Amino acid sequence: MYNYHLLEDRDVLCIDQKSFFASVSCIEKGLDPLETKLAVVADTKRQGSVILAATPKLKELGIKTGSRLFEIPHRNDIYIINPSMRKYLNVSVAISKIALRYIPPEDLHQYSIDEFFMDVTDSYHRFSSTVHAFCERLKREIYEETGIYCTVGIGSNMLLSKIAMDVEAKHSQNGIAEWRYQDVPTKLWPIQPLRDFWGINRRTEAKLNKRGIFTIGDLAKYPYKFLKKEFGILGVDMHLHANGIDQSKVREKHKISNPSICKSQILMRDYHFDEAKVVMQELIEDVASRVRARKKVARTIHFAFGYSDEGGVHKQYTLKDPTNLEKDIYKVVMHFADKLCNKQALYRTLSISLSQFINEDERQLSLFEDEYQRKRDECLAKTIDQLHLKYGKGMVSKAVSFTEAGTKHGRLGLMAGHKM
């Protein structure tokens, strides 16, 4: 077991804006987020469109994030609207500015548009007598100035504050929960299923279940050397986290050692394989352009075709000759997709990711490739990039993007895939 007395016991807050997108949309219309049934939908004109957010009252009807537009009952008291990303960003920034009245910028970490961490160890006592009183004050100011309700997790570290917020604060009467090291056996260990714990997905859960691990307590008591043998460094992290230990600090900003450039898309309807290939080509066009903009070439390709029901196909491949050309990437993806994908299946999700970059001027010439033709391809691709940059991404498009399967032109002008 671990000796918690050797660990630093800080006052870290994890703050989540309750039903953020739906709440902002309600407030913009002068509606009460807690009493209104409202759904934010990716595209209100498409019945298969995904629900991005729902108010608590709508969730009571069984409609939640990830549901589809056609699942919403036809009722006069239900509002269905498109997202407004600019408005969401403005409100998110306003809330962060409220938090920065109390702490220096280095003590705030923006985890997502509607969630952030604050380390108030050295500052809360200047404004309130206790951490709980400080949280009440902060929640009140955010509500009074933006109309947004917040839930707050208080913890000895970032992990415990996050879990306290997710597991307890969201369901408590005052929206605040505090988890300390001494609470680990009574609050953290009973959590199950394992996938409800931060950082554990269904695949990892299945592997742990085979070893008789069903609760976080089981995981905490399991010999970490076996976890390390099976999962590597991830196994060590899981064991530490299951015991409530997280050495990361808000001030220590995480640096990505092996960045990737990726793009994914949830399709508005079920696509046949040949149609999914069109969208995959559009996604590859986008990521290849972004790699060229950084003057890089990529060595590793990872792609996924997700079926409309469950499962799908994913594959990672490392190239001998790194590239930033769409045709090279598409050729590799289709080589494996044609072999691995079920041609009779219907598809709903697609993704492509490029990684393992080197500078494009460091790429070695290949004796097995026509370098003159490659140079022409690169010049053409960069010319199209410049046209897109100057006139917009719709200036030059492949013919397939104008087919019924194409989605490129329907997504022009969107932010994060949604309307501004």
Regions found by a protein language model. Give the residues of each.
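DNA-contacting surface of Y-family translesion DNA polymerases
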Residues: 5-7, 14, 206-347
